[in-house]
């Protein structure tokens, strides 16, 4: 359990696919590395025992087996010489090497006695060694005492100006802060530790910190990023002589592989690691490897093996007093027993887990444990007790969210805790508490957007000098990356790009926790929501879960929860199959009808309405509802206007909040970017788009083919609106990032981008619109998500006529985090984006019709619907891949008043 650490605010949680090489390049800096490894030895007095010097070196390398042997020998020699100081120092090192082998109370008592010795009170180096041992030993059972020990280590190291021990203390404090639910402080501490280790080329510490962050990322459901960290740690460990066996890195990698659908690879790693722990007599590490083996077995569907591993880990942990490991192993066992219907065994294990939790301050995992107990009570039919436990879990989750340092960590926390919201919703639905069920799900949905709609945004002028310098370096690296296709050069640039990303730190930060709490948006009241709905409008808010999924139906008069005829797994599998057929340019009528029956068929209000506002869940974020076919064989598009929103709360704010000043300019369009290659032929359009979306940030790179239809698309849109004196077109050499940013963006009602787009679900901040680059500017030509959120807009509409611009990283019940959401954060009322790779010529025709209908006074959602109908009327029943990629997210209910 102690391996789990939250990623840092400065985005050390986002690495390139080649991140392992970032740190390996440090091996070339031999002088720095040598200095880092010898710093501890040089800091000791000249008459220090040679054994202690070597033991300290091995200890810093986490090679505690060999270090312990040397500390024991040094202790004997010091006793023979009568050197009390070295005797105490060696004893502290020996005690640290015995973690898991000796009684914790006995070891703690011996350490307390040493620390009370006058020699230890006056010798900072000796005291650091003993306090570090105390902190390591007591972290499992007495985190408060461990925290005080590491805080004193930090203070002493600052007095000695010892950067190595300062960084190590901050990393250990981060672990304890995270377990206590203080995610913002934990993020800051770990960021500082990792930055320091990178600057000093402290390779052993990078192995430790990289493993910690990687395991934390697995906890947050970000396995792809976690794998990069752990690969880096393992590569470094393999290159550093005498380093201890990196158990946490192997555990991290195996868990990440299991999450990524590769459990067999993970199991192979863990079996080797388990043998190593037993050979080295490391019971704490053995218990954690057993837990990881259980997780991998569960991911592979072998639930019997999973429970055996968890139970074995629990027995080993109880025998050795590993409190966190008891809680972790029994929690995992309880989940598996619950899923196979063995509720008595599940409750037995979770009761043991909760008893262990009460002995330590692990606020981060508390909501998850409470949710398991709540789910068990619900399955037993005790809905009142289940609701009480879910309420406790929700309160504990809110405490964590109140401490989150930025909107991405907030989103990741919500994603991790999604089962809490879904389970609580299901219980409220079964109890008939519709308003309460709505409040529960709306607490999570679109949370970061709802919060930031009311929170002041950090503006460019408020960046520190260091942040501005880091941003300039970042842009230079991206410009260079865009120019080269050499794999070796790109690999090096991607590594450097990651390091520059970590120094950017441009995310919005609240002034203080108290102020931030007052700015957090509460879920909208149902009565208030109904006041902003149109007479013919119904909101469909979906909750996908097993065994039952739900649709919360809201119109101006009432709200009702409808149980859908399938669970989340069946709906998600059908959706994935349907989308695969769509992207293959097929009609997929059978699945289109099945999804209609599952998602819309039970909604009895449907025939009485003409406008649907969809609040999606899970895979439904990728599904264009308008392509489904009803009982009459017609598309939903033919009977209903469809738009989408992150949540009902966000929808309410978008319809009620007004910009400080109404925009005076009608249209800003950017297109005809002079990319480097001419297209080969029109049949390759979608393949070209797919290659671009995939290739900007990989080793091979991607060529940017010009989009010949984009010029006429932008010109046609502007002409359709017929406001030439209130429009600005940025075409050809003027279609640059710097030109775009130089415009008074807050003064435009419509922003239109006809450009290439880059989707990056693994690294969402890298998602970008690819504009031109002015050689006189420092901009890189990539308008990235992180930059978009810092814009100040008042636009009624942003149109992203580029591939995959309505996609992003799915953050559980929070929703999608991508380009469309970034523009909503920046102040746009609505965003039109694409769910897949779009056809250049088809897009031109659709957009021309869209703007024509806008100019005629139709509301935004209706104008987009009519443009799609026009396309079908002209070309017949073409597959949805051509006409359905564009969806409207946000408020599409009103026309744009020019």
How would you describe each model-predicted region?
Residues 49-50, 89, 129, 168, ...:
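Residue register of alpha-helical TPR repeats
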Residues 492, 618-620, 657-758, 800, ...:
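A domain-level signal for caspase-like cysteine endopeptidase catalytic cores
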Residues 383-639, 652-686, 694-698, 719, ...:
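Amphipathic alpha-helical protein-protein interaction segments
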Residues 45-46, 85-87, 125, 164, ...:
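Residue signature of alpha-solenoid helical repeat architecture, marking inter-repeat boundaries
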Residues 749-849:
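Catalytic cores of nucleophile-dependent amide-cleaving enzymes
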Residues 72-76, 112-119, 152-162, 191-202, ...:
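Amphipathic alpha-helical segments of tetratricopeptide repeats
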Residues 657, 661, 666, 842-898:
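An often Trp-containing, charged/polar helix-loop segment at the C-terminal end
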């Amino acid at each position: 359990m102690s391996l789990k650490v939250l990623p840092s605010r400065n985005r050390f949680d986002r690495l390139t696919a080649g991140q392992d090489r970032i740190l390996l390049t440090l091996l070339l800096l031999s002088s720095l590395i040598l200095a880092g490894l010898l710093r501890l030895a040089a800091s000791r007095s000249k008459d220090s025992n040679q054994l202690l010097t070597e033991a300290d070196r091995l200890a810093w390398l986490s090679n505690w087996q060999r270090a312990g042997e040397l500390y024991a020998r040094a202790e004997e020699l010091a006793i023979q010489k009568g050197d009390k100081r070295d005797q105490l120092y060696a004893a502290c090192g020996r005690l640290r090497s015995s973690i898991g082998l000796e009684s914790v109370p006995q070891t703690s008592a011996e350490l307390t006695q040493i620390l009370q010795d006058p020699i230890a009170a006056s010798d900072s180096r000796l005291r650091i060694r003993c306090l570090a041992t105390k902190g390591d030993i007591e972290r499992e059972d007495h985190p408060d005492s461990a925290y005080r020990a590491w805080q004193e280590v930090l203070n002493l190291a600052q007095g000695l100006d010892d950067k190595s021990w300062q960084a190590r203390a901050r990393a250990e404090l981060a672990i304890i802060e995270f377990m206590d639910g203080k995610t913002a402080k934990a993020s800051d501490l770990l960021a500082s530790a990792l930055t320091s280790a990178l600057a000093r080329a402290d390779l052993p510490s990078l192995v430790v910190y990289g493993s910690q962050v990687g395991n934390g990322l697995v906890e947050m459901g970000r396995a792809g990023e976690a794998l990069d960290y752990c690969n880096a740690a393992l590569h470094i460990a393999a290159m550093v002589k005498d380093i201890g066996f990196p158990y946490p890195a192997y555990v991290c990698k195996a868990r990440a592989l299991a999450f990524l659908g590769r459990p067999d690879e993970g199991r192979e790693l863990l079996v080797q690691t388990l043998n190593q722990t037993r050979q080295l007599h490391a019971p704490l590490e053995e218990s954690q490897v057993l837990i990881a083996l259980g997780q991998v077995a569960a991911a592979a569907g072998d639930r019997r093996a999973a429970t055996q591993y968890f139970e074995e880990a629990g027995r080993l942990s109880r025998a050795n007093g590993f409190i966190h490991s008891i809680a972790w192993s029994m929690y995992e066992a309880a989940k598996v027993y619950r899923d196979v219907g063995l509720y008595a065994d599940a409750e037995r294990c979770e009761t043991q887990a909760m008893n262990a939790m009460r002995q330590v301050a692990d606020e981060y995992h508390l909501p998850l444990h409470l949710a398991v107990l709540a789910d068990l009570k619900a399955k037993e039919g005790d809905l009142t007790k289940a609701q009480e436990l879910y309420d406790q879990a929700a309160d504990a989750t809110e405490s964590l969210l109140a401490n989150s340092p930025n909107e991405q960590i907030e989103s990741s926390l919500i994603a991790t805790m999604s089962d809490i919201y879904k389970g609580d919703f299901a219980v409220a639905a079964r109890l008939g508490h519709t308003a309460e069920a709505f409040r529960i799900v709306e607490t999570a949905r679109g949370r970061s957007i709802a919060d930031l709609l009311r929170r002041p945004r950090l503006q460019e002028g408020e960046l520190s000098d260091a942040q501005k310098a880091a941003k300039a370096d970042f842009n230079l690296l991206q410009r260079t990356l865009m120019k080269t296709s050499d794999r070796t050069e790109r690999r090096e640039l991607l590594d450097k790009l990651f390091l520059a990303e970590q120094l950017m730190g441009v995310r919005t930060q609240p002034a203080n926790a108290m102020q931030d709490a007052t700015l957090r948006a509460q879920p909208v009241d149902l009565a208030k929501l109904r006041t902003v709905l149109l007479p013919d409008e119904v909101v469909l808010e979906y909750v996908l879960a097993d065994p039952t999924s739900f649709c919360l139906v809201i119109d101006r008069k009432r709200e009702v929860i409808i149980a859908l005829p399938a669970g989340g797994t069946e709906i998600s599998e059908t959706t994935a199959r349907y989308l695969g057929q769509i992207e293959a340019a097929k009609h997929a009528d059978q699945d289109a009808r099945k999804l209609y029956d599952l998602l819309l068929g039970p909604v009895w209000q449907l025939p009485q309405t003409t406008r649907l506002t969809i609040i999606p869940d899970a895979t439904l974020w990728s599904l264009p509802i308008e392509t489904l076919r009803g009982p009459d064989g017609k598309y939903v598009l033919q009977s209903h206007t469809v738009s989408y929103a992150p949540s009902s709360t966000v929808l309410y704010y978008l319809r009620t909040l007004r910009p400080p000043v109404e925009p005076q300019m009608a249209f800003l369009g950017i297109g005809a970017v002079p990319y480097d290659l001419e297209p080969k032929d029109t049949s390759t359009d979608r393949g070209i788009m797919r290659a671009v979306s995939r290739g900007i940030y990989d080793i091979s790179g991607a060529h940017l083919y010009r989009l010949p239809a984009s010029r006429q698309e932008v010109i046609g849109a502007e002409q359709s609106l017929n406001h030439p004196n209130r429009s600005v077109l940025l075409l050809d050499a003027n279609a640059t990032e710097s030109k775009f940013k130089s415009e008074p963006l807050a003064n435009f009602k419509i922003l239109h981008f006809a450009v290439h787009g880059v989707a990056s679900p693994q690294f969402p901040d890298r998602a970008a619109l690819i504009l031109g680059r002015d050689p006189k500017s420092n901009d890189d030509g990539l308008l990235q998500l992180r930059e978009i959120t810092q814009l100040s807009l008042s636009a009624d509409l942003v149109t992203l006529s580029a591939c995959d611009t309505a996609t992003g990283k799915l953050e559980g019940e929070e929703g999608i985090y991508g380009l469309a959401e970034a523009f909503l954060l920046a102040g746009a009322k609505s965003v039109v984006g694409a769910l897949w790779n779009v056809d250049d010529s088809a897009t031109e025709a659709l957009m021309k019709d869209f703007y024509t209908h806008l100019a005629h006074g139709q509301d935004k959602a209706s104008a987009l619907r009519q443009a799609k109908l026009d396309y079908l009327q002209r070309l017949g029943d073409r597959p949805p891949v051509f006409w359905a990629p564009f969806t409207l997210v946000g408020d599409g209910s009103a026309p744009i008043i020019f």
